[in-house]
Amino acid sequence: MTDERAILAANAAYYHAFKTGDFAEMSRIWADDDGVSCIHPGWPALVGRQVVLESYRNILRNPDRERLDHRDEKAIVSGSEGRVVCVEIVSGAGVALAATNWFRRIDSEWRMVHHQASPIAAMLAEAAPSSQRLN
């Protein structure tokens, strides 16, 4: 498997863990060091494995959490690091987010070291269900 495909598979595993609420899988995806970071939409920067994973534990245990789909993935690989940029669609909310998921190869596995997502203003109307659109 090429590095690009392996990073895209790790990225898909991240979204699958989010979608299914699988905290154990989410924990396996993140690197085991305090150099990891995460910026959830509207949140301050979180730094450190314990803080980042606690944020996901709280999000995933919420039965009313947002449902995410992702699309338009692009993988960029440079040596032992790579990132995926993609669009996250928050189901039912009419919100599209630009996301960056950064991975590092650790012991032959691609592990997440950073996630960041923020709203894309130009795509808000496009992402909204037709019943919620203003035009």
Please describe what each predicted stretch is.
Residues M1-R28, V36-N135:
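A beta-strand edge to alpha-helix "cap/lid" segment located at domain peripheries
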Residues A31:
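Helix-to-beta-strand junctions that scaffold the AdoMet/dcAdoMet cofactor pocket
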